[in-house]
Amino acid sequence: MNYGFIKTAASSLKLKVLFGHNTFNAVLINHNSALEKNVKLLVTPELSVTGYTCADLFFARTLLIESERAVAELADYIKGKDIVLLVGAPVPFFNKLYNCAVVIDKDGVKGIVPKKHLANYNEFYEKRWFASGFDFKEVQSISYAGFDTKIGNIVFDLGSGAILGVELCEDLWVPNPPSSFLALCGANIIANLSASDEYVSKAQYRRELVANQSARCVCAYVYSGASVFESTTDLVFSSALSIASLIIDVLKLTSATLSFKLLAAVFINP
């Protein structure tokens, strides 16, 4: 925090689908760039550790093991550093697999938030692999990436008045987004880890959706979309990044660039 402001960033990754260690290195590049710019909250895309487009390989035990190992390595790397990092990972829990946001800070894995609304129409069929976060009627304990932590509907106190809520992609596109309830629970920053593909006119609609939800919840909204390197199947992704905060009338939107470092960063007042 700096005079009541916190610097946040939405980040795209130069990843290789399935290769957890490669993604680990990509996150480190963006993380180090974020530290240089004094970013305190860094948000990466949905399933950023493995890639969103793994399809039936989400059933592979090796993928889940390597994903958890990559999260453990990230947690170890940022230990003691003044930054909060959000990464997306598939998390197994009681014989079900959840599409999750993993919140990591200087002390380790701070908590895990599962995606509630699974996209299962047209080009999406997430219910084939994942269970819904609505399974969690209350917060549960979990051992993950070497840490005893919590999984479920969690808001995170980042200190100095900054309260973080998390949702994932489709959660924003439904009539009653989880972020609305998170705001009612005190969240003044919402992070969205997303893998929204592209088609004609969708970019503008998505941009307005982020801005409108920020206004509706009277909070900052940090949106990180899947990298262009996810475009390995019949879906096209554009590294869509947005940060909206109506409190200071700021809206930033960037598309993919060749640097793939820190693509969107802004001070917000929580």
Language-model regions, residue ranges each:
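Enzyme catalytic cores with a strong preference for nitrogen-chemistry domains
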Residues: M1-V250
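Low-acidity, Ser/Thr- and Arg-rich intrinsically disordered low-complexity segments
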Residues: S238-I248, K252-L263, F267-P270
